[in-house]
Curated annotation (Swiss-Prot):
Pathway: Cofactor biosynthesis; thiamine diphosphate biosynthesis; 4-methyl-5-(2-phosphoethyl)-thiazole from 5-(2-hydroxyethyl)-4-methylthiazole: step 1/1. Its cofactor is Mg(2+). Catalyzes the phosphorylation of the hydroxyl group of 4-methyl-5-beta-hydroxyethylthiazole (THZ). Keywords: ATP-binding, Kinase, Magnesium, Metal-binding, Nucleotide-binding, Thiamine biosynthesis, Transferase. Gene3D superfamilies: 3.40.1190.20. It comes from the Bacteria. The keyword Metal-binding applies. InterPro entries: Hyethyz_kinase (IPR000417), Ribokinase-like (IPR029056). Its EC number is 2.7.1.50. This is Hydroxyethylthiazole kinase 1. Substrate binds at residues 39, 187. NCBIfam families: PRK09355.1, thiM. It comes from Streptococcus pneumoniae (strain CGSP14).
Length: 260
């Protein structure tokens, strides 16, 4: 299984083209975990950095016409250097423009994985799910949504919710770890996209195990943070979550994982 130890040994450079709201939180989370983040947003700079990158995150949270062009340019450069790309199609079910951008990036460029909540991924495959912007209500068929997207796009899929589902090559696993505090802190989902981008390229041909490890590390760190003093308060949880990402070990993952 792809391990946290391997990530810390390789310390992959992860280029994060992400939304303005979460850049600081994302960078701190990746550093705590053991990756090396770069928040570059200029094509000439990306040309230089992606030569050495282990992953690229495209997060469409703060979407503009200019950012759409940036995503396209970054994806072309990433393909040139064979850098795995994770797409986070934030709120793509909330309106036609976001859906149009997400469809363009999925259908016309090479992606290593797509990570989104149930409402976002369901919108990509035409399944009706109650959603509001970046949030989606509890969904019972999250594994079916993941499989439908995996089959449609032939791309590894991560769907997050009260239970998380990962679908790769027609196989699906569900992750039952996590903290109810995560949705109460802005940026936890966006940071997860960057964590997925950190793990996805560690071992070629092991996408399912890499994604499973990424999700377990992230969710168990959330459980650890919530259990700490005042971890039930959003401000404290945010800080303790970064601390937990720094402290979590492969042994913690092995002991506390709940996978079906």
């Amino acid at each position: 299984m792809t391990s946290l130890k391997l990530l810390k040994e390789k310390a992959p450079l992860v280029i994060c083209i992400t939304n303005d709201v979460v850049k600081n939180f994302t960078a701190n989370g990746l550093v705590a975990l053991g990756a090396s983040p770069a928040m570059s947003e200029f094509p000439a700079d990306l040309e230089d950095l992606l030569k050495y990158a282990g992953g690229l995150l495209i997060n469409i949270g703060t979407l503009t016409d200019e950012n759409w062009k940036l995503y396209q340019a970054a994806l072309k450069i990433a393909e040139k250097y064979n850098v795995p790309v994770v797409l986070d199609p934030v709120a793509c079910g909330a309106g036609e423009y976001r859906k149009k951008v997400a469809d363009d990036l999925i259908n016309n460029y090479k992606l290593a994985a797509i990570r989104g909540n149930a409402g976002e991924i369901a919108s990509l495959v035409g399944i009706d799910v109650a959603s509001k912007g970046v949030d989606s209500a509890g969904v019972d068929n999250i594994d079916e949504i993941a499989l439908a997207a995996n089959e449609k796009f032939n791309i590894p899929i991560v769907v997050t919710g009260e239970v998380d589902a990962i679908a790769v090559n027609g196989e699906v696993v569900t992750i039952h770890n996590g903290s109810a505090m995560m949705p109460k802190v802005i940026g936890t989902g966006c940071l997860l996209g960057a964590v997925v981008a950190s793990f996805i390229g560690l071992e070629k041909g092991q996408e399912l195990k890499s994604l499973e490890t990424a999700m377990l590390v992230y969710n168990i760190a959330g459980e650890m943070a919530e259990k700490r003093p005042n971890g039930h308060l959003p401000g404290t949880f945010k800080v303790e979550f970064i601390n937990a990402l720094y402290e979590i070990t492969d042994e913690d993952v092995k002991e506390f994982k709940r996978v079906k």
